[in-house]
Amino acid sequence: MPRVKGGTVTRKRRKKVLKLAKGYRGAKHLLFKAANAQVMVSYRYAFRDRRAKKRDFRRLWIARINAAARMNDISYSKLMHGLKVANVDMNRKMLADLAVSDPDGFKAVADTAKKALA
């Protein structure tokens, strides 16, 4: 039997990796071995950062809510507790968006929390 080197399969696989490595600097977008190593690292970064993104956005929302709450003379923790007591079911993403896009609406929400705590 003749020896099979898998030319078309190998070329297709290498071409796919080099396509994924487009935009990388130096040999990492030209040479298969370097490109393959960098693509593997990039996959690890992407996996890690998909999880970190959730934490980062939550931190951003909390910072925005806290800033808007303090402009309405209430701390973040008291605002959240007041909303829980008042049975206002708004998540942090919605509150942060409200704080940025509609300060008057956020003021009404903050007043609701204050009344629930009083």
UniProtKB/Swiss-Prot annotation:
rRNA-binding recorded as keyword: yes
Gene Ontology annotations for the cellular component aspect, listed alphabetically: ribonucleoprotein complex; ribosome
State the disulfide connectivity.
none
Q: Which domain of life is it from?
A: Bacteria
Record key words, sorted: Ribonucleoprotein, Ribosomal protein, RNA-binding, rRNA-binding
**What residue range is the signal peptide?**
none
Pfam families, per this entry?
Answer: Ribosomal_L20
Q: Which GO terms describe its molecular function?
A: rRNA binding; structural constituent of ribosome
PROSITE patterns in the cross-refs = RIBOSOMAL_L20
Q: Which GO terms describe its biological process?
A: ribosomal large subunit assembly; translation
Q: Which family is this protein grouped under?
A: Belongs to the bacterial ribosomal protein bL20 family.
Function, as annotated? Binds directly to 23S ribosomal RNA and is necessary for the in vitro assembly process of the 50S ribosomal subunit. It is not involved in the protein synthesizing functions of that subunit.
- Name of the protein: Large ribosomal subunit protein bL20
What is the originating organism of this protein?
Lacticaseibacillus paracasei (strain ATCC 334 / BCRC 17002 / CCUG 31169 / CIP 107868 / KCTC 3260 / NRRL B-441) (Lactobacillus paracasei)
